[in-house]
Amino acid sequence: MASSDTQGKRVAVIGGGLVGALNACFLAKRNFQVDVYEAREDIRVAKSARGRSINLALSYRGRQALKAIGLEDQIVSKGVPMKARMIHSLSGKKSAIPYGNKSQYILSISRENLNKDLLTAVESYANAKVHFGHKLSKCIPEEGVLTVLGPDKVPRDVTCDLVVGCDGAYSTVRAHLMKKPRFDYTQQYIPHGYMELTIPPKNGEYAMEPNCLHIWPRNAYMMIALPNMDKSFTCTLFMPFEEFERLPTRSDVLDFFQKNFPDAIPLMGEQALMRDFFLLPAQPMISVKCSPFHLKSHCVLMGDAAHAIVPFFGQGMNAGFEDCLVFDELMDKFNNNLSMCLPEFSRFRIPDDHAISDLSMYNYIEMRAHVNSRWFLFQKLLDKFLHAIMPSTFIPLYTMVAFTRIRYHEAVLRWHWQKKVINRGLFVLGSLIAIGGTYLLVHHLSLRPLEFLRRPAWMGTTGYWTRSTDISLQVPWSY
């Protein structure tokens, strides 16, 4: 691209989280003058950043976005590979379900460390600046005017050519767009909340298998654990809020864990479990959908601001990072023409982001209930077998989502088609087995034991059975 296409144009990125910081890097590479406005203080110097910290699962889509700005190797080196789900049954039995083939894995990444690295990357560009402690209070994107409140709480107007809303599920930018006609918006809170717990290292090593995402599925609730670089595990307990409210005391919590997660107690330690459980209240999870993602050539939403999703497919960050990558690819395609790029971004991306939102809701049930069933394990084995013999025809859903850039909505369509083909194949196979079994049964039952029914009535049966005493009784199993 020619630098004159963008040089001198100002972009205001609202939100300095993961997607906002990554977007700033992409835009700075295109020679925009980039200003990132982040309401929080700089997490790199903050004393405590505890809060929203469900560990992240970095997969192929996210890695491709990081690769495009030259950060993939740096980030991957700070992650722990996870090659399988490790299912913990109530009895303590463990069973591994691989995510894909032997070379495929996802990475457990620290949200905080990733955000720090991305902010540092933004500041490496001379044409980009991050304004910490600056909160958006008013947005008029058609006029390119924003009002922000700095650390001194004094309103200050700034001007820009493009507003990029990356300010999360409760986006202020989106709230302003919602006042516009023909802007659709829905949100849904799920009944479950989440709480973060910790499994510390044991004798300086991991207390469990490190290269797995550990799951304790218990139907109505579940717990997961992701490995960290310091040999600890970050655990997340997902449970209906009503269940959390039934655990007001330490003894209630201990009884609950002894009943539902007995093998986790010695791993966490009773004292650490109590400390973590009562440190913060359970946090809500929200799913957000909106349409369109843009306003003319002036404003665009990305990441959670456009499509907050529940965390059960591990694609929230990856989908947000892919937003940035798709937008960058469209900027190439349309030679940095914002009036063409923004509408195409909405048209292209909305079906995909809504599809991964729906898949995450589906996985919300699968992870806490279905993984316990033998039918689920059979389906996974069948998917793996079919993919091995027909790799380009049958691709497991998780493989399409986590290890390719097949569009999310196309992956869903293909998944439904594959399920239909497999179900029909199993029906035909079952029918053939039933027909074959019936034929063999009828064939054997039509042999000699029924001959007496065809004898003349006047011969009676006495003579028949009398003669039969002189020889072995001729029934099918005597042949």
UniProtKB/Swiss-Prot annotation:
Keyword set, alphabetical order: FAD, Flavoprotein, Membrane, Mitochondrion, Mitochondrion outer membrane, Monooxygenase, NADP, Oxidoreductase, Pyridine nucleotide biosynthesis, Transmembrane, Transmembrane helix
Tissue: Expressed by organs containing secondary lymphoid tissue, such as the lung, spleen, mesenteric lymph node, thymus and peripheral lymph nodes.
Main enzyme class: oxidoreductase
The protein's Enzyme Commission number: 1.14.13.9
Protein's membrane topology: Multi-pass membrane protein
Catalytic activity: L-kynurenine + NADPH + O2 + H(+) = 3-hydroxy-L-kynurenine + NADP(+) + H2O
Signal peptide interval: none
Domain of life: Eukaryota
Residues given in the record as L-kynurenine binding sites: 85, 99, 363, 398
InterPro entries: FAD-bd, FAD/NAD-bd_sf, Kynurenine_monooxygenase
Sample GO molecular function, one term: NAD(P)H oxidase H2O2-forming activity
Ranges that cross the membrane: 385-404, 425-445
Classification via Pfam families: FAD_binding_3
An example Gene Ontology CC term for this record: mitochondrial outer membrane
Effects seen without this gene: Mutants show normal fecundity, fertility and longevity up tp 2 year. They have reduced serum 3-hydroxy-L-kynurenine concentrations. They are protected against extrapancreatic tissue injury to the lung, kidney and liver produced by acute pancreatitis-induced multiple organ dysfunction syndrome.
Cofactor section: FAD
Localization terms from the record: Mitochondrion outer membrane
Binding positions for FAD per the UniProt entry: 19, 37-40, 57, 111, 136, 172, 304, 317-318
Domain statement: Transmembrane domains are required for enzymatic activity.
Primary role: Catalyzes the hydroxylation of L-kynurenine (L-Kyn) to form 3-hydroxy-L-kynurenine (L-3OHKyn). Required for synthesis of quinolinic acid, a neurotoxic NMDA receptor antagonist and potential endogenous inhibitor of NMDA receptor signaling in axonal targeting, synaptogenesis and apoptosis during brain development. Quinolinic acid may also affect NMDA receptor signaling in pancreatic beta cells, osteoblasts, myocardial cells, and the gastrointestinal tract.
Family note: Belongs to the aromatic-ring hydroxylase family. KMO subfamily.
The name this protein goes by in its record: Kynurenine 3-monooxygenase
Species in which this protein is naturally found: Mus musculus
Gene behind this protein: Kmo
